[in-house]
Amino acid sequence: PTAESTQYGKQDYTVVPIEGLDLADQLHDGQNRCTLAKAQRGAELFVFGLAKKVILADSIGALWTDIIGAGGVGLANVSTPLAWLGIIAYSLQLYFDFAGYSEMSNGLAALLGFDCPANFNLPYISGSITEFWRRWHITLSGWFRDYIYIPLGGNRKGAARQLFNMFLVWAATG
């Protein structure tokens, strides 16, 4: 949400890792308490994530807003090079927002004594769309695989059904 807005949508709550029963097991495991090493790792993750969000994402986002915003150049008047700069700025803002939120979430979990899986793995260096999907919001794609794609039959029921299942997952992810 913006500073001027108090409206929150589903996108404001879906950038953190999605945990299933693996985390529930940690709730009952007495050995999974917070240790000094885990707290240090958690604090580092949180601080680096906060820096990515506040210093990088917000600053780069301001550039995007200056280019397309009402007080800025505006889409109707933007030159081609400036439009490309805006596209790159927006892509980097998304990247650092998501990376920052994911690291902050994992850092807080570690501070509380929990181990959460990595949720983000440098997706912009991917060599294909498939690899990009596997690197961006890792836990969300795993959730859709485990709870939608595989129960529908995955790739075990022929090519046509596999394409249909993939389409349903893509439609469900928005």
Predicted regions and their residues:
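Membrane-embedded transmembrane alpha-helical bundles that form the catalytic cores
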Residues: 1-174
